[in-house]
Amino acid sequence: MGKKQVRPPRALPPVPSAIQDDIPLSRPKKKKPRTKTPLASASSEGLVQTAVHRPPEGSEPPTKDSIEHQEAPVQRRQKKTRLPLELETTLTQKKTASPSLLPNENGINVEPDEEPVIQKPRRKTKKTQPAELHYANELGVEDEDIITDEQSSPEQQSVFTAPTGISQPVGKVFVEKSRRFQAADRAELIKTTEKIDVSMDMKPSWTTRDVALSVHRAFRMIGVFSHGFLAGCAVWNIVVIYVLAGDELSDLSNLLQQYKTLAYPFQSLLYLLLALSTVSAFDRIDFAKTSVAIRNFLALDPRALASFLYFTALVLSLSQQMTSDRIHLYTPSSVNGSLWAEGIEEQVLQPWIVVNLVVAVLVGLSWLFLSYRPGMDLSEELMFSSDVEEYPDKGIKVSS
Amino acid sequence: MLQTSNYSLVLSLQFLLLSYDLFVNSFSELLRMAPVIQLVLFIIQDIAILFNIIIIFLMFFNTFVFQAGLVNLLFHKFKGTIILTAVYFALSISLHVWVMNLRWKNSNCFVWTDGLQTLFVFQRLAAVLYCYFYKRTAVRLGDPRFYQDSLWLRMEFMQVRR
């Protein structure tokens, strides 16, 4: 109660007035027509008065208020203009949103008066906005106080204390958004704040282990992509080589001339993809645990086989680096300082083509092995859910 | 206790350095228009490896296991990574020195010998293994068990002592 009597300052909210300074330019005309109609103007004035002069007149009956409205025109005009603005901006929304709530709070106090009073509730809620905003910050605590106030006050002090008990129980809270106050459900606000609390509580569950696990899974995705891409690239490469070389490798000089710009870039790309694929395949068998890896390999586990094939392909591919560079620097044998002496072509290219073919086959096979069960990942099982027996709670969390 | 945000940051830095390493290993042979380009790439690559070594050791120091004085346990668990990283670092530097030495005058000439080819293959293979082991270690160090006393830690300690 004491709090409510302190409210008077609220009646002249400094912030809204600043807002109004900007707004009037666009909207004043709309408001004036409204205020000019006798009923409406009287009501609005009345509202203003009760709201604004509440503190000093706290004990006076409402009828006096209406008399005063007529006596003090100037100040009221100013306030009048202010209030409509507020109405437009905030209360219009409020009307639509919470028609039932407003009557509840004010209805009891105001009913003795006539029609205009019905609007009163809206005004008052406006006036209470600053307070409500304040409460919005401390929703949990204030709500309890509000309920008790409402129950005790309304019937006993029906006429006189209109402003005091009324404003509190509003279901709406006015939140300032982009320089306007907008109605929001108190219940919703509480919910959102609760949600925030909940999320704060949940955060700790996102542990470093989860980060590691998500990174591991992300890398596995990259690995799955690189397996397929590598297989496709290798097959494409070998097809291009055989097409360029002609029937039974009869046109090797043509192959060299055409392929020399491609040789080194492809070698680089092959290494990149092979490295990614090999690491990814190692991940799947948890290569670091040698005993497990060897056991899996001996058991002809597809993942272990794929890892072995990838590693072999990597070694073979790397061993052709020198030849690739030689192809890259190809100049016809007639040119001075050529690396390609007459007749050496077939001797150099034959093994190179065979190795490329083998690499393509190995890579294709590995891809088949791995794509047979793309979801299987031994290192995830071993690294992240090991010792489940010792830590049943953690183990469950991780395995899920 | 290791903070999730800190760990994420460190992990992303490690992966950044690893991917740079992979990139240079893959495409340095292509980017040899001028010897200086390769030189800079190689220097940064070596520094990246060095940084990665420093980071992984800092992560070790940050574990409860290390702070409790169980260095041997840590070394036992991650000796593969430590040794391999050191070997890879040595191989990288030697290959870089050799290649730059051969190519400094003319970056576009054929410099390959059997020795260089062998070193090249070993260095690149070590790079793949290093990438795998380092990644695995970095991910494993996210395990909260390394940052608190636990039954698991005690049992591990007993195993190592035996």
Swiss-Prot record, chain A:
Superkingdom, natural source: Eukaryota
Membrane topology qualifier: Multi-pass membrane protein
Skewed-composition ranges (Polar residues): 97-107
TM helices/strands, residue ranges: 221-241, 262-282, 297-317, 352-372
Keywords, sorted A to Z: Cell projection, Cilium, Cilium biogenesis/degradation, Membrane, Phosphoprotein, Transmembrane, Transmembrane helix
GO BP, one annotated term: cilium assembly
Record's subunit section: Part of the tectonic-like complex (also named B9 complex). Interacts with TMEM107.
Family: Belongs to the TMEM237 family.
Residue positions where Phosphoserine is found in the record: S17, S43
GO cellular-component term (any): ciliary transition zone
Chief subcellular location: membrane
Function of the molecule: Component of the transition zone in primary cilia. Required for ciliogenesis.
Protein name: Transmembrane protein 237
Low complexity: compositionally biased ranges: 84-96
Region (Disordered): 1-112
Bias (Basic and acidic residues) ranges: 54-71
Compartments it resides in: Membrane; Cell projection, Cilium
Pfam families documented for this protein: TMEM237 (PF15383)
UniProtKB/Swiss-Prot annotation, chain B:
Membrane spanning stretches: 7-27, 41-61, 80-100, 115-134
Coiled coil regions in record: none
Any GO BP annotation: cilium assembly
Subcellular location per the Swiss-Prot or TrEMBL entry: Vacuole membrane; Cell projection, Cilium
InterPro entries: TM_138
Cellular component annotations (GO), alphabetically ordered: cilium; vacuolar membrane
Annotated glycosylation sites: N6
UniProt cross-references to Pfam families, sorted A to Z: TMEM138
Membrane topology qualifier: Multi-pass membrane protein
Keywords associated with the record: Cell projection, Cilium, Cilium biogenesis/degradation, Glycoprotein, Membrane, Transmembrane, Transmembrane helix, Vacuole
UniProt similarity note: Belongs to the TMEM138 family.
Purpose of the protein: Required for ciliogenesis.
Protein known as: Transmembrane protein 138
Species lineage: Eukaryota, Metazoa, Chordata, Craniata, Vertebrata
